[in-house]
Amino acid sequence: PFGRFADIPIYSDAYTAAHLRARMPYCFVDKVYPGVPRIYLQEVEAGQVFHINRTEVLPLRVMHGRLPILGYRIGGRLGYITDMHMMPEESYEQLKGLDVLVMNALRPKPHPTHQSISEALEAAGRIGAKETYFIHMSHHAGLHADIEKQLPPHVHFAYDGLEIDF
């Protein structure tokens, strides 16, 4: 499990890939010693479709504060975005027509690098997925059951172990 017997695939833009190689050089040598994660690093570009097996994946530009990062549209039906504070208009357009959106919603109060719950609700409303699941919440978000009651019927606070069928 967790890459012990197989490479862990990581799909990132060139900037992130360079930082991973610089900060974790021991993962990218020819002979990796026991206990070191085996990483398969694949560089991708925002707006350029790639495939994982036969599934189409579209990387989307989003911002983590001032740091450009990637979110993903997977298989045309799933959007996955974490660590986002805002996204450009083009990325909103690329997320239209989703069945499921998984997106970060850190806490009620604003944060410089993550969406607040109200910002996430606004972004989710603009995207218009059939179902939205908020992830990456802090302990400041409040109790799961209390927050869930305040969300629209198609928006949910995710939880560990959640499985989504769509």
Question: Model-predicted segments: where are they?
Answer:
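Binuclear metal-dependent hydrolase catalytic cores
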Residues: 1-80, 146-166
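Switch II (G3) loop of P-loop NTPases
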Residues: 80-86
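Cap/insert and terminal regions of metallo-dependent hydrolase folds
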Residues: 86-166
